[in-house]
Amino acid sequence: MNISIIPTGDEILLGIVVDTSSAYILQEFIKKYPDCEITRKTPVADKTDNIIKAMERCVASKADLVILTGGSGGGHRYSSTLSEDYTHCALGEYLDEFEESEIYGSNGHLWCKLVCGRKKKSLVINLPGPYVEACAALDAFLEVYDPKEIKLSQINQRMIHAVYNQYPNTQASYIK
């Protein structure tokens, strides 16, 4: 199995935030699939075109699985001072087919969006930026992932519920 990890976000690219999720992804995949080949790509800036190009390179290199970590949230829908959701825009634009789910807070703001889909023969998923949420989503993915029978909806639902369970009951309002 050939796996590519693409960390996204200006904060990771510039070294403002340390990418701890990639190390966890590597560790967990090596535990479950000791013969897999994993490559962590150079972090990608928050620009839709850059993220699409990074995914294109991974798919062209015949990656079985492409994992994007972090990126921008959906806060720009509520405040123009918050950044655009580049990672999810890129996923929606690039993938041939996909499933997506969102978690909203009691204030109505988007807290998390997870996408899993296909491009050619590659499965592409994203993990949230916050480490605890990323670990929960990855653990859920690994529980349900079967390289021989990929069910996008099942993968997406398992991952989003795992992330939802990381929030206190009084704060996370609903899953869409």
Model-found features: residue ranges?
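Non-catalytic beta/alpha edge segments that cap or flank active sites
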Residues: 1-176
